Amino acid sequence: MTFMAKAGQVERKWYVIDAAGKPLGRVAAEAAVLLRGKHKPTITPHVDCGDNVIIINCAEAVLTGKKLEQKKWQRHTGWIGNLKTTKYATLMAQRPTKAMELAVCGMIPNTHIGRAAETRLHCFAGAEHPHASQKPEVFEL
């Protein structure tokens, strides 16, 4: 018989990923798998089975090739003619956690389960984080 998890049966772990010197996309891909719970044998498609993920050293993550100068982040303010464009070099210098969140959230589906998974993502520019009391496990890439 196939096991179908219920919302109350899901046990959530905490994982910490160090992004220092690692490609942004590889860190984001592993974080997305952990957030969705795809690494668990008890995954159920209609239940949020994911874990909590802490990503530290987002400022030290690297972009390969010429992406730092060529890749752009676009957002719209809602006003006519106000499409804001920012290069990733500027984004990584000013808001490295936003760059990591954009990468991870782009790999998670836009559903109610995906939005719930995005709330369990915690990104920090440095090596310190306030979630030591949860006793997170180190996740090696």
Mark where each language-model region is.
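Ribosome large-subunit tunnel/peptidyl-transferase-proximal elements
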Residues: 1-102, 112, 130-141
